[in-house]
């Protein structure tokens, strides 16, 4: 219960906090080889666990790290570990004047869960800035990197959400390890697409405004 946004539910048979990528790989492999049910958390938002708990292994990913390559023509290519808190990352992009996800402020959870659900708000969604996603393929035990196109994003859906394991467990075939984003440079937001947000900001739909104002709205 302490590890979900709803703060309800029973205990797991085994609960592990993975602070490094190596720990994530080891724990996922251990559970899969043992044939145990596996639940991977990278934030625990919008997750309901019954009072009976979870009869398997829960791996909570809390990996940290942000690496950026910035150029005047290519913008900012930013690779983020799956366990980084999402809203703190959004705040950091605004501070760095990287434009693209300012409208997704206030969404709970961690970076690794955002491409799975293709999270969105106010007419924006994360697929608009995802450059690539690096994962562990549980079926093959190998790393697999997806381009934005290969992620098969649609409304609140992706290949990561739709690709299941044969046992049909709660965690899918691909465990997200890191997400790379591409941002434009500057202190102005992307064009405001959502009418209500535009009204609050005092601009027309399609106009830009300071990213910090979008976050505060």
Question: Where do the protein language model's features map onto the residues?
Answer:
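Phosphate/pyrophosphate- and phosphate-bearing ligand-binding catalytic cores of soluble enzymes
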Residues: 2-8, 143-217
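Anion-binding (especially nucleotide phosphate/pyrophosphate-binding) glycine-rich loop
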Residues: 2-139
């Amino acid at each position: 219960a302490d590890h979900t946004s709803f703060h309800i539910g029973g205990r797991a048979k085994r609960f592990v906090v993975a602070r490094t990528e190596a720990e994530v790989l080891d724990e996922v492999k251990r559970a899969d080889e043992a044939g145990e049910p596996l639940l991977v958390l990278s934030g625990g938002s919008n997750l309901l666990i019954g009072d009976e708990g979870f009869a398997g292994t829960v791996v909570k990913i809390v990996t940290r790290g942000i690496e950026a390559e910035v150029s005047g023509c290519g913008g900012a290519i930013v690779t983020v570990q799956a366990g980084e808190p999402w809203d703190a990352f959004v705040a950091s992009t605004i501070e760095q004047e990287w434009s693209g996800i300012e409208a997704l402020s206030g969404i709970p959870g961690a970076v690794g869960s955002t491409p799975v659900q293709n999270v969105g708000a106010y007419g924006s969604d994360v697929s608009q800035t995802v450059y690539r996603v690096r994962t562990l393929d549980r079926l093959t035990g190998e790393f697999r990197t997806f381009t934005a196109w290969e992620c098969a994003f649609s409304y609140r859906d992706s290949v990561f959400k739709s690709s299941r394991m044969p046992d049909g467990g709660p965690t899918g075939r691909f465990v997200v390890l890191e997400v790379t984003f591409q941002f434009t440079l500057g202190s102005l937001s992307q064009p405001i697409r959502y009418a209500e947000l535009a009204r609050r900001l005092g601009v027309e739909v399609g106009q830009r405004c300071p990213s910090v104002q979008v976050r505060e709205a």
